Design a protein with these regions (language model features):
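A conserved regulatory-domain signal marking ACT and ACT-like small-molecule sensing domains
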Residues: 2-14, 26, 30-32, 37-154, ...
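Intrinsically disordered, low-complexity, positively charged segments
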Residues: 15-23
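The feature encodes a structural signal of leucine-rich repeats
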Residues: 21, 160-161
């Protein structure tokens, strides 16, 4: 699941404060006092953090196994026998099938993720999803440590030192990838025309594509997610930067699209 949000970036003594709302914190199980691993690429305005020390050799697996005696133990034993470190795992039974997820570190190991997949299939299981951090090697060299804290009001924030690259104050877009417990923070400089767009879509094929097409005519989209609660069924949130035209023009285009039932725009940190 991908969960997105927005935060103000405030300068504090010794560094920067990036607030984390309840939606992001809930997706990643964050709490005050927790230490997170993090890293950024030189010249980049993005910081990646995680509850686990991810690196380019970490892989995520979702595995389905037949519910036979010892099937779950066999999968776990497979990782252990190869000397692969399981950073996180979980499983549950669904009818006569076991659904299990693993995040495993293959760093400095002779075995590869492909080897594990082949052997899992030999055990009678099948891998339905596999996201490999090798696809994003620069995003997952998490060697620094940062801390989650809480202010006087109990609101959580990530405390960053002054020398973290890309931070200039202003605002940040937060993108939580719950499957691998990772949070990507894109920093935007003060004055950037950041927008928060909310849209209620008609439940017909192509509605989300239409919304994306309309917004993309004027906005560089950074993050999109659906509001996953009953009161907001069909509501989508988009965070992006206005590139051309006015907000009034954007709203007019959305109102002309039958696929879009409601469309709202809020400026973040600037006025038109």
């Amino acid at each position: 699941m991908i969960v997105c949000g927005h935060s103000k970036v405030e300068r504090v003594e010794g560094g920067w404060r990036v607030y984390i709302d309840e939606k992001i914190a809930g997706a990643l199980n964050l709490f005050p006092g927790q230490n997170l691993f993090g890293g950024s690429t030189v010249g980049s305005s993005r910081l990646s953090v995680s509850t686990m020390q991810l690196n380019p050799h970490v892989s995520y697996f979702r595995v389905f196994m037949e519910d036979i005696m010892g099937s779950l133990a066999s999968v776990t034993e497979l990782f252990s026998s190869k000397g692969v470190n399981i950073l996180s795992s979980g499983a549950f039974g669904l009818g006569n099938i076991w659904v299990s997820e693993y995040i495993a570190d293959f760093k400095d190991k002779d075995v590869t993720a492909d080897d594990i997949v082949n052997e899992l299939e030999g055990l009678g299981g099948f891998v339905t999803s596999r996201e490999i951090t090798e696809f994003f090697p620069q995003a997952f060299e998490l060697e620094s440590t940062y801390q989650i804290k809480a202010d006087d009001k109990g609101e959580m924030y990530l405390l960053l030192p002054e020398n973290v690259g890309g931070v200039t104050g202003g605002h940040a877009i937060l993108k939580a990838w719950a499957d691998i417990q990772a949070l990507f923070i894109d920093f935007l400089s003060p004055g950037t025309k950041l927008l928060e767009i909310s849209a209620m879509l008609n439940d017909i094929p192509g509605a989300l594509n239409k919304l994306s097409s309309v917004v993309a005519t004027q906005v560089n989209m950074h993050a999109v997610d659906a509001q996953h609660h009953e009161e907001a069924t069909g509501l989508w949130m988009i965070y992006g930067v206005l590139q051309i035209g006015s907000i009034e023009e954007l709203v007019s285009k959305a109102e002309d699209a039958p696929e879009i039932l409601k469309f709202g725009v809020r400026t973040l940190g600037w006025t038109e």
